[in-house]
Amino acid sequence: MQYPFQEVESFWQKFWEEHKSFQTNIRSSKPKFYCLDMFPYPSGAGLHVGHPEGYTATDILSRFKRMKGFEVLHPMGWDAFGLPAERYAMQTGIHPAITTKDNIDNFRRQIQMIGLSYDWSRELSTTDPDYYKFTQWIFIQLYQSWFNPELKKAESINELIRRFSNQGSNGLDYRQFNSEEWKNFSPVEKEKILSDFRLVYQAEIPVNWCEALGTVLANEEVEEWVGKGYEVVRKPMRQYMMRITAYADRLLEDLELVEWPPSTLEMQKNWIGKSEGLEITFPFLKPLQSGLEGIRIFTTRPDTIFGVTYMVVAPEHPIVSEITTPEQKQKVEEYQKTSSLKSDLDRMELNKEKTGVFTGTFVFNPADPSQKIPVWISDYVLYGYGTGAIMAVPAHDQRDFEFARTFGLKIIPVIEGEISEAAFDSKTSTCINSSSSEISINGLDYTSASSKIISWAESKKIGRKKIQFKLRDWLFARQRYWGEPIPLVHYPSGVTKPIPESELPLVLPNLEEFKPSGTGESPLALAKDWLQYKDPSTGEIGTRETNTMPQWAGSCWYYLRYIDPKNGRFLCDPELEKKWMPVNLYVGGSEHAVLHLLYSRFWHKFLFDIGAVSTKEPFDKLIHQGLILGEDKRKMSKSLGNVVNPDDVIKEYGADSLRLFEMFMGPLEMVKPWSTRGVEGVFRFLNRIWRLFHSGSQESFRLDDVEPTPEELKILHKTIQKVNEDIPNFSFNTAIAQLMIFVNEFTPSDRRPKKVLESFILLLAPFAPHIAEELWKRSGKMESLSYEKFPEADPQYLVESEILIVVQVNGKLRDEFKAPKDVSQSDAISMAKNLDKIKGILEGKTIRKEIYVPGKLVNLVIG
């Protein structure tokens, strides 16, 4: 007799949908549990069996929490804007609006086949104008805000304007002007100053340009697309940026508030990259015509300043043309052109050959003015990091060492150590060769020497102690069609303004030609009627911004919209936000450890500053599921032909088999290979469960109204205890193993005690909900078990009356026996000697020593 899974699963999926079984009562007085999956990008390929792993894990926990009396919010939606969707549309020749809808429909169908308990009434898509209305609203708030360094929070740009009107730029780390000068600035001059403070601003910067994709990529995106075979080069462009760096300290500090995997916390810390050091200027031998007096650098090793033998400026640094002598101009320009064809990843490759060109210019070392230092350009220095220039200390930095060896530059050791074949970097050795008429740090350790150099530089007003971050501002604009339109308008007067909030959403126009232009201009530039905009307050005619937002924009705040998805006035009702935030559990791939998680934390902190949310962090607990590999133990890929489609697995074995197997494969966070034989094994287990409740035919359901025996209650409550412990800890594999032990214990028996087996059905329900619902119904219950109380273990049945004692002879395991829990030493040794196997070993031997470890083992030492 086989479990009729097709019939059962079809019935219950339809039942849950018709009865809206998993709709959240958002205003419930029950304790809340917000369980969230990272919503998927709906690709044309659909799901493979790796996708349901995380979804099944959150579903088990959501079902468990409902049965524990929680009001559960467990939604699903679609991250559907962005480059992948547009590329798919270009490959198929079908408009992305159509392909995206078709892909979403397919994803939804596949997800619903798995029996996941989502509240589909809250389904959302980032491409829905009712959704991106508020993505655009958040953008406008960012544009109209600045970060007050004194308060360490965002404020309205109007507060900054008031400050300038009252006291000028006094107290800010900015070029100084007074209130009268501010009032006399033109509107364009004022806007340029405000742009230096806005959380959204435009800048002419070297960007990662991909010709094949026709767009720029954020630094964090380059590795992914280069890995896919696309060429990415550096190209100067005027781009919209988000000042995420203003929040660097808070992004770092508030990692203490969350329960995330240590590896993810470390990745975020490293990406933010906080470091303390010295910012100092190395003066030119004579000032430049522009008035520039020197090259500013930042170093975390002020103690090595006497070891500087050359300086390096990034090839794309704006001062390169100024500092290059006529004799070196051709070589420098050729090198700049060559380096622009390389991505940052290529340039930062540690093992690559070092290249560079001398600019013809010299500076002197401020700590030792007698030292004349040549200034080079080299692509191992990036303009986007630090100041875009470095002081090179080849004796104590490996890249500088290799560069110096390549070009025959001096290598001066200033820290005790061996540098014959490689740079020697140490913070424990003392300084040598570090003395001049200005200052001496010889004999000092790293801490003392660095402190002395910083104090000296500050007293001379040539440098200052500074905290630096590796984190760069977020490159926000994309020269693509399929994204949220940026709600800004550029006017001939030189001023840029957002459209009125009452005009949101700014809807993406329906263009038939959506391919990139190849010129760096967005396809939206072709929407002539859409481009022109008349300012409702001034009547001035302007041009809309044609770049679109990156894919990450919509995913920065979607967790808030699930709480209140139909609200047309605000992104989320404040009362509901206070009740439901933060997200209790967030599950998704570790590939999002930096990008999505960092961007969403940034937006959330901004929303916290303006009072739109009540929590400092969006996601309390984070779990990363491990990859499921193909049966060949390689990552699933169409090109490798090892993709397993969940549709096929469900068709042959059922959704409960897929769910159980993926949770039984091993710990959730581990990488695991797919196994068809493993699915077959789990399918056999479900059939054994079915037969446990049926005697002979599909209609012969059996539960007996008999009192359970103490042994039956022991195995039940041991199982209850184990499952209750394992589900919150995501130890689903061991919980399922315990359910299997239960079935093994009961299968040989002819007894089917109702009280015991009904509890087992409830224990099974989070893992295999279809079969559990069917068995519950067949037991005579009129309601779905989704909200039944989850079983609790009775402590009296968890106490073991017997213990297992192992028997060793000369330290080798020979046998074991059960004994009363309070067995005495003499009785335990006697019982061990009377075991048949032990009697045989002891025959003719002398027992020299008897050892008893209470409750664990007997060891007999014989001669």
Swiss-Prot record:
InterPro entries per the UniProt record, alphabetical: aa-tRNA-synth_I_CS, aa-tRNA-synth_Ia, Leu-tRNA-ligase, Leu_tRNA-synth_edit, M/V/L/I-tRNA-synth_anticd-bd, Rossmann-like_a/b/a_fold, tRNAsynth_Ia_anticodon-bd, Val/Leu/Ile-tRNA-synth_edit
Residues given in the record as ATP binding sites: K638
Gene3D superfamilies named in the record: 3.10.20.590, HUPs, Isoleucyl-tRNA Synthetase, Domain 1
Pfam families: Anticodon_1, tRNA-synt_1, tRNA-synt_1_2
Residue span of motif 'HIGH' region: 40-51
Keywords: Aminoacyl-tRNA synthetase, ATP-binding, Cytoplasm, Ligase, Nucleotide-binding, Protein biosynthesis
Residue window of motif 'KMSKS' region: 635-639
Catalytic activity as recorded in UniProt: tRNA(Leu) + L-leucine + ATP = L-leucyl-tRNA(Leu) + AMP + diphosphate
GO annotation (BP), single: leucyl-tRNA aminoacylation
Chief location category: cytoplasm
Record's GO cellular component terms: cytosol
PROSITE patterns from the UniProt entry: AA_TRNA_LIGASE_I
Subcellular location: Cytoplasm
GO molecular function, one term: ATP binding
EC number: 6.1.1.4
Family: Belongs to the class-I aminoacyl-tRNA synthetase family.
HAMAP family in the cross-refs: Leu_tRNA_synth_B
Name this polypeptide is given: Leucine--tRNA ligase
Gene: leuS
